[in-house]
Amino acid sequence: YPLAVVNSYAKNPKTLQKKMQKKIKHGAIGIITQPVYDLENAKLLLELNENANKECCPEQKNAKLIFGIFPITKLRTAQFLSAHVPGINVPNSWIEALRVANARGVEEEYKVGFELSKKLFEDLKELHPKIHLMTANQFKIAKDILN
């Protein structure tokens, strides 16, 4: 299947819509986002995808949006993604919660990160049940999030 990828965040959301339109125009039937960490951002991505489908090729089948989610269970991971991976935005509330948990120990840090990630997964699934769960070969975390 012709799938494409797109950033999950941009300072100017219209650039994301233009990129989606270009991918749809070239035949993408599905667009997978970089990991999403904010429900409001997810809602915006759905709106941008809808607009891109309408403006690009209304005669074609619509390209479906698939949210990427990468569970974060460590403060260092959240900081790295936020600072060094373009197109991904980890909310400050997540970073702060993980910072506090990290000070309490590794187990607490994992627990807080897992709970944030699980809640996000459940919220995204309720909003739009097309999700790509990325776990970097951590199959247990995938199983735990899906259960």
Regions found by a protein language model. Give the residues of each.
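Alpha-helix-loop-beta-strand connector modules within alpha/beta enzyme cores
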Residues: 1-4, 45-69, 144-147
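Active-site-adjacent beta->alpha loops and helix N-cap segments on the catalytic face
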Residues: 13-15, 35-53, 138-145
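Catalytic beta/alpha-barrel core
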Residues: 29-39, 111-112, 132-135
